[in-house]
Amino acid sequence: MFDFFRKSKYVTVKPETKQKEIPDGLWQKCPRCGEIIFNKELEKNFKVCPKCGYHFKISAWERIKLLCDENSFVEFGREISGGNPLNFPGYEEKLAEAREKTGLKEAVVTGLGKINGREVVLAIMDPNFIMASMGTAVGEKICLAMEKALEKKLPLVVFTASGGARMQEGIFSLMQMAKTVQLVNRLNAEKIFYLVVMTDPTTGGVSASFAALGDIILAEPGALIGFAGPRVIEQTIRQKLPEGFQRAEFLEQHGFIDAVVSREQQKEVITKLLAWHSQK
């Protein structure tokens, strides 16, 4: 007979509150469309979002790996590094932090390499190093690359990515604009092919000097290109800017750059341009 007065025994189960931890570094979220992308898939796709085509920022060495033939790149100018000519407070610590973070001494990597068998001089700016701002060392390395192209009669390919002049170096930073432009004039006089690829962002003193003077100027999709940022311009002129103003596609439509080329097509396009402008 069933005992209605007997108390049933219950076991209290505590709800699971601890969430499963997902290891860091497995995926990234696209800042444009919000798509969650596994890093391995992103690497295979040239660090480009497979859903919306957003181009993630990449380091100088990642770009060299994508662009140059295997084991063909030989760096020069690595010993050049910036100092603190104005004794700007905290600048030396900022440089040390950037060097530890990136493994670079400065914001641009220069060297000789081959692109589908064609030898070129390369200068590739790295936005991870103080936004690749241009100080004395960056200006010196860009000029060194130009001098190497003149010496060896080789095409020069420069990938730009910069927040502009490095404010901690003041007038010494601004002097690099004139310095690099003088070397571009020498390239023109010697008929050395000079190709610029603008990546996000290319702004300030870099956009107003050597970056805007290429024989051919390409840009990555969506790259921000201009001297001052859109917010500063709007505040100055007190007008709303057109949609996409200062983006690569807008500038291509208005004749400022020659073509917008996605990252996966760059090696092929650059190879064709080198062939068309070859002196040999």
From Swiss-Prot:
Keywords per UniProt: ATP-binding, Cytoplasm, Fatty acid biosynthesis, Fatty acid metabolism, Lipid biosynthesis, Lipid metabolism, Metal-binding, Nucleotide-binding, Transferase, Zinc, Zinc-finger
Chief location bin: cytoplasm
SUPFAM superfamilies: ClpP/crotonase
Recorded catalytic activity of this chain's protein: N(6)-carboxybiotinyl-L-lysyl-[protein] + acetyl-CoA = N(6)-biotinyl-L-lysyl-[protein] + malonyl-CoA
EC numbers, comma separated: 2.1.3.15
GO cellular component: acetyl-CoA carboxylase complex
One term of GO molecular function: ATP binding
Pathway where this protein functions: Lipid metabolism; malonyl-CoA biosynthesis; malonyl-CoA from acetyl-CoA: step 1/1
Enzyme class: transferase
UniProt cofactor note: Binds 1 zinc ion per subunit.
Segments forming domain CoA carboxyltransferase N-terminal: 26-280
Gene3D superfamilies linked: 2-enoyl-CoA Hydratase, Chain A, domain 1
Zinc finger (C4-type) in chain: 30-52
Residue sites binding Zn(2+) per the record: 30, 33, 49, 52
Location(s) in or outside the cell: Cytoplasm
InterPro entries xref list: AcCoA_carboxyl_beta, Acetyl_CoA_COase_Trfase_b_su, ClpP/crotonase-like_dom_sf, COA_CT_N, Znf-ACC
Cofactor: Zn(2+)
GO biological process: fatty acid biosynthetic process; malonyl-CoA biosynthetic process
Subunit text: Acetyl-CoA carboxylase is a heterohexamer composed of biotin carboxyl carrier protein (AccB), biotin carboxylase (AccC) and two subunits each of ACCase subunit alpha (AccA) and ACCase subunit beta (AccD).
Described purpose of this protein according to its UniProt entry: Component of the acetyl coenzyme A carboxylase (ACC) complex. Biotin carboxylase (BC) catalyzes the carboxylation of biotin on its carrier protein (BCCP) and then the CO(2) group is transferred by the transcarboxylase to acetyl-CoA to form malonyl-CoA.
Record family assignment: Belongs to the AccD/PCCB family.
Entry protein name: Acetyl-coenzyme A carboxylase carboxyl transferase subunit beta
Gene this chain is encoded by: accD
